[in-house]
Amino acid sequence: MSIEALKARLPDYAKDLRLNLGSVLTTSSLKPGQVWGAAIAAAYAARNDDVTRAIVAEAAQHLDAAGLTAAKAAGAIMGMNNVYYRTVHLSGNADFKKIPARLRMNVIGNPGVEKVDFELWSLAASAVNGCGMCIEAHEREVMHKGMSTENIQDAVRIAAVIHAVATVLDAEAALSGQDGSTAVAA
């Protein structure tokens, strides 16, 4: 599955998403590897088979093996951390903030790529997963490492569009009685 095939499957009511998917992946203040790493992490968070396949296939042209693995790892570890820390953040129980998480997160300390890139990709996944505490932490890290507000906005725009595309494809699949990986838009 290619990005163009994904765009072709979007129904006319999602034309804005079709156009945005092309633009956020090609027009950015980010380096190409940063764009595609953010896209992978967002696709993992969005959980649509075809979106993930298309994004990872295209990203393989822009990232080396270490970058692909690190972007997948960002999506994976944020799948855990975003649930945990969103609960800590939103719970009325102040004790949660005092107790150690006791969850392995070694990949954050040694992602195999530049730390700023991994943090940016984690921010993209956190935006999809809606963890405010994680968004703030990753935003602070990338800003501290020299990224601009525009860089952060571009990563979040990528995440937003990928999430929306996955949502539409899943909804259209549900309406047609198919699973999310085989739907065809009318």
Swiss-Prot record:
Coiled coil: none annotated. The keyword Disulfide bond applies. It is an enzyme of class 1 (oxidoreductase). GO terms for molecular function: alkyl hydroperoxide reductase activity; disulfide oxidoreductase activity; hydroperoxide reductase activity; peroxiredoxin activity. Disulfide bonds join 131-134. GO terms for biological process: cell redox homeostasis; response to oxidative stress. Keywords: Antioxidant, Disulfide bond, Oxidoreductase, Peroxidase, Redox-active center. This is Alkyl hydroperoxide reductase AhpD. Its EC number is 1.11.1.28. The keyword Oxidoreductase applies. The active site is at residues 131, 134. InterPro entries: AhpD, AhpD-like, AhpD_core, CMD-like. It catalyses: N(6)-[(R)-dihydrolipoyl]-L-lysyl-[lipoyl-carrier protein] + a hydroperoxide = N(6)-[(R)-lipoyl]-L-lysyl-[lipoyl-carrier protein] + an alcohol + H2O.
